[in-house]
């Protein structure tokens, strides 16, 4: 924290520095520190989507979609040797990271109506995701000239990693899903869904998880006994229950891992980094929800919900 009377600038507008004793605060002037420890970032990103859609018969839509998400990121960090706290020894570091995610989705959606009042909507689908990331970082120290504060001018390796901050990973998802909806005359609604998902973040015996949901809704405003209530413009009662899954854990949390980057007496080495658990599996949540949706004069809405989640 800075005291309010510490001025980061000199009277002539230049940045106050500990080098010439123009900085009167403790430690370093933050602006001076940033000037002598610059960091530059670059990021290039490409998003692309390609799809094909056909309607072989009335009400049936078959769609296949392919998406690619690519990103290339670099960073260059410098710490100039002339900066007071560096004692004449600079530091320079570079890092680079490439990430690619590929997604393919295939769906078949069939909608039809019988006798004008019975409406159906069915969906079947599949989705696969494959993601890869790799990167590196290196830092060299010992530079003795501000103009030559680069990797090649360092004399000692300060740090190095071919997994730069966890950027080396790969994972995959595979999903199959289905959904069905039915409504009678816009009054009674029923829907259900079923899906099964596999994640590479779990061991081979626990990668698959199955999840389902069922929902009911009654549009009371369509009933005759509410037709005369002009002030009540929306009245819906809904009940749903179902399960969902969560796989948001480390990419290799189920595996026992070792890690490099250690050294002993000048020799490189590895050490145990993680104790794996092959029994890790999907986190499952079961949610039941009861909701009442009300609308008054087409101006005021009121939603009341009760739910139980476990």
In which residue ranges do the predicted regions lie?
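Surface-exposed loop/interface segments of Gram-negative outer-membrane beta-barrel transport/assembly proteins
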Residues: 1-45, 65-174, 220-287, 293, ...
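Structured alpha-helical segments in the cores of large, soluble enzyme domains
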Residues: 174-184
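Transmembrane beta-barrel architecture of outer membranes
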Residues: 175, 209-211
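Transmembrane beta-strand segments that form the barrel wall of outer-membrane beta-barrel proteins
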Residues: 190-199, 239-241
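Solvent-exposed loop/turn segments connecting transmembrane beta-strands
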Residues: 200-206
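Outer-membrane beta-barrel "beta-signal"
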Residues: 214-217
